[in-house]
Amino acid sequence: MKKLFKISAAAAMIGVLALAASGCGGGSSKKANVTNEMVKFGVTNFADNLDPADNFFSWVVMRYGLGECLVKFDNKMNATPWLADKWSISDDKLTWTFHINDKVKFSNGDKLTAEIAKESLERTFKLSNRAQSIFQYAEIKADGQNLIIKTKNPTPSLPGMLADPLFIIIDTKVKDRDIKKQGPICTGPYAVKTYSKAKAVMVANPNYWDGAVPFKNAEIPTIDDPNTRAMALQKGEIDFAINIAAGDLQLFKDKAKYNISEIASLRTVLAQINMNEGKPLHDPKVRAALIQCLDRVTYNKVLLKDTFIPGKAPVPPSLDYGFDQLKDPNAYNPENAKKLLAEAGWKDTNGDGYVDKNGKNLEIDFVFYSGRAELPLYAEATQADAKKIGIKVNMKNVDYNVLDPMRQKGQFDLIISNILTANTGDPEVYLNWYWKSNINGSQPQNSTGYSNPKFDALSDKLAVEFDPAKRLSLIHI
């Protein structure tokens, strides 16, 4: 029994722009105010600060136009040059040489050198245990504008790994800056003017190296509630809104007023199941019963208006690894779910509507955050369907900054989040984070107790395989 159930995969990523060029605004009476002087983005935000080595905050640093990496991805998820304009690998497959683009400057005018890039990467590894779970290096050194990384083992995906926002390059020459309060000095098109979790104000980087910066100023208010975010766009209070809830999409169908950007996502929504000994979901029959009682098809069709699809595998169909050929082993079957609970010794002996054993009801704590509109909907639907077979689900809505530490400490029975499945170009790192055995903290995201030697062996083969066809075969579901 896998340690997590996929209740949704390949979510559509949806953003809306209130059109300004046509003279139409973000609502029926107010015009959008997009100009070269100012643009306003309504976003969700989980970052308490802008230190890219803290938590997953590097994603915000990049999304806000501050940070850039040595490498980036093209539209087909191929690793392409960014701050490094070329790279090569030694014959022994252990030493990579990345040449730093001589044109790149930080927002304060400092030139990006290989030495600064080296110090920035070393800082990330010092402060983030997640970096070690992506790749491990034996040595990093600078030789002129060449950044030389020697890995402990052959690492075929290293360029893609360095495209993860965790490895944003910051100016380490600046010693007197409080990065958590002021944000880092980076190479992106914008620099921080002011930052709080509630609102960020960015200004154009006067030293930007890669073309014209479109707006002189950008205001980025945090509007976590999806309905409020949609309303702000309608009223013309913001010019862009991201992650529009499925139920609000019909508000923006007027193409004269709004432009909707919608793509098949590489993200997936998954709930991890804590199967450690002593937990209520330690019993495989109870885990199977829980999964089989959930009507995921209806969740996605009715609650989310077909903007999501039911999941049945770790990797979504937007990545070509055989998703459509799979049969869901735990499809919706509430009657069989009840049977499984009975076989596991859980029965409602006192008529309170919940199954019990040894005088205790079967209760599970479901931890979620509400920054993404779909997560509370799934949690509520899970609570309702689980009750039908006698499982009591206690809802725990927490801030994301609380959720991830709870995940790493195993302080949950169920925990749900929205995850990127190819942050390094393919699913290798994502699969390792949530499925590979967590030995001495090597995979801190996997605190569920799940461990499978067969998976670990396949993962170890994938980690050193350079041939694309063989990598595809190893990942293929």
Region spans (language model):
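Gly/Pro-rich hinge or "lid" segments in bacterial periplasmic/extracellular proteins
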Residues: D74-N78, A163-V213, N217, P334-E335, ...
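Structural transition elements
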Residues: P310-T349, S370-L377
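Aromatic- and charge-enriched surface segment that lines or borders ligand/interaction sites
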Residues: D85-L127, I148, P280
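Surface-exposed binding/hinge segments that line
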Residues: S88, D92, Q132-K173
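Extracytoplasmic/peripheral linker and loop segments enriched in polar/acidic and small residues
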Residues: K392-L403, N432-I475
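Ligand-site clamp/hinge motif
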Residues: P206-L251, K392-N394, D399
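N-terminal lobe/hinge region of extracytoplasmic solute-binding protein
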Residues: G42-I89, E122, I185-C186
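Ligand/substrate-recognition segments at binding pockets and active sites
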Residues: K347-A422
